[in-house]
Swiss-Prot record:
Heterodimer of LeuC and LeuD. The gene is leuD. InterPro entries: 3-IsopropMal_deHydase_ssu (IPR004431), Aconitase/3IPM_dehydase_swvl (IPR015928), AconitaseA/IPMdHydase_ssu_swvl (IPR000573), IPMI_Swivel (IPR033940), LeuD (IPR050075). This is 3-isopropylmalate dehydratase small subunit. The lineage of its organism: Bacteria, Pseudomonadati, Pseudomonadota, Alphaproteobacteria, Rhodobacterales. It catalyses: (2R,3S)-3-isopropylmalate = (2S)-2-isopropylmalate. The keyword Nuclease does not apply. It comes from Paracoccus denitrificans (strain Pd 1222).
Length: 201
């Protein structure tokens, strides 16, 4: 998993509330077990017409936001059914951070396991960030995980809170496997001791 320290990039404004996981990645794309390749189907039914042509008004189809790395979203982002494909699709598109007033719990937890930083901020702050994101590609937002701040293109800085353990994992690029591998030495020692003391196990 890639480390997340400081991210400066284009932020896409998505003020719609209750964006659920089926909107993020529709059910017909859940057959794969591969994390790569889902980015093209991110927000599929919002991005494309039935004939496969792009819907010009959708934010990620607009030239200014095609390279977005941050989403500033409406309340309750990631609600709906549990599917890890949702953060997979976001990450494969290039999204590393989503900012909202609230997230569905399962989606929130899945983000951390896949290298995406979900940030919860008060409505008044999200409103400011949403307006900054509407400035387009020339307005770059900065998310500083080390200092726990989000800074707008005009220099306004807002603090956010995050569980220290989750912050540690993102800063060091540690998913569940990475955390286990940190203990590889201790695991090997334990197994060697068990082989000596309980060879029948």
């Amino acid at each position: 998993m890639d480390k997340f320290t400081t991210l400066t990039g284009i932020a896409a404004p998505m003020p719609l509330v209750n964006i659920d996981t089926d909107m993020i990645i529709p059910k017909q794309f859940l057959k794969t077990i591969h994390r790569s390749g889902l980015g093209k189907n991110l927000f599929d039914e919002m991005r494309y017409n039935p004939d496969g042509s792009e819907i010009p008004d959708f934010v990620l189809n607009q030239p200014a936001y095609r390279e977005s790395q941050i989403i500033v979203a409406g309340d309750n982002f990631g609600c709906g059914s549990s599917r890890e494909h949702a953060p997979w699709a976001l990450l494969d598109f290039g999204i590393r951070c989503v900012i909202s007033t609230s997230f569905a719990d399962i989606f929130y937890n899945n983000c951390f396991k896949n290298g995406i930083l979900p940030i919860v901020m008060p409505q008044e702050v999200v409103d400011v960030l949403m307006e900054d994101a509407k400035k387009g590609a020339n307005a770059r937002m900065t998310v500083d995980l080390e200092n726990l701040t989000v800074t707008t293109s005009d220099g306004q800085s807002f603090p956010f809170e995050l569980d220290p353990f989750r912050r540690h994992c993102l800063l060091n690029g540690l998913d569940d496997i990475g955390l286990t591998m940190e203990k590889a030495g201790a695991i090997d020692t334990y197994e060697a001791q068990m082989a000596q003391s309980r060879p029948w196990v």
